[in-house]
């Protein structure tokens, strides 16, 4: 699985980036690897990805907006308790307000990015009952700005959630496996069957299918 993630990231190298990272869920543990510079640095750090074990995960290449091009600022970002990992494209306009609120509640930040507020909001709203959709909806309700988000939760190993507002996000539908990306280029070697999310939509993606919801949580298709 990690080979497909890394291959997808390599297909997006043409867009330019300053760091790369990958997170996979191995049982109930999220494994994380990040590196500055080219994807080959991430490959070297993980022995071509063989150090990563799992069957569900996400990856990202970052072009710095908020925060310098450092390993700490590279995506994915992980919650303090290790339950959530996320990647995001876009800009969260109210991130400083959210950051100050979360810090006041005791959440520890390890980066300068606007993205990290999202993973801590997920942690704050999650009740531990496996209801990831409600957690995501509450989190999205606090965000102002544009985003395309991928969310991995250690308590929900059979699903991932996606959310789009103003930035491209695409589901790739395979046979017994599904994918997501911000650019169809990362998907075409695995599937030609793709679904483009609309603004305000979120999606639950599983190996056996997917469900798209509107901003209220009502199924769309």
Report residues per predicted region.
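Conserved short alpha-helical segments that host acidic/polar catalytic motifs at enzyme active sites
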Residues: 3-221
């Amino acid at each position: 699985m990690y080979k497909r993630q890394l291959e997808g990231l390599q297909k997006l190298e043409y867009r330019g980036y300053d760091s790369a990272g990958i997170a996979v869920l191995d049982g109930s543990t999220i494994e994380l690897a990040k590196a500055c510079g080219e994807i080959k640095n991430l490959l070297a750090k993980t022995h071509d990805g063989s150090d990563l074990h799992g069957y569900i995960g996400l990856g990202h290449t970052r072009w710095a907006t908020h925060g310098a091009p450092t390993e700490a600022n590279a995506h994915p970002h992980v919650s303090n308790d290790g339950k959530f990992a996320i990647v995001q494209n876009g800009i969260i306009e109210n991130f400083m307000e959210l950051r100050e609120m979360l810090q006041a509640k005791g959440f520890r930040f390890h980066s300068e990015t606007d993205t990290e507020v999202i993973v801590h909001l997920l942690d704050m709203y999650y009740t531990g009952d496996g209801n990831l959709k409600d957690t995501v909806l509450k989190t999205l309700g606090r965000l102002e700005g544009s985003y395309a988000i991928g969310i991995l939760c250690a308590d929900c190993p059979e699903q991932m959630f996606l959310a789009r507002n103003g930035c491209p996000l695409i589901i790739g539908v395979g046979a017994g496996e599904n994918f997501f990306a911000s650019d169809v280029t990362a998907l075409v070697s695995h599937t030609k069957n793709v679904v483009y999310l609309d603004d305000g939509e979120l999606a639950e993606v599983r190996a056996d299918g997917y469900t798209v919801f509107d901003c209220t949580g009502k199924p769309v298709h």
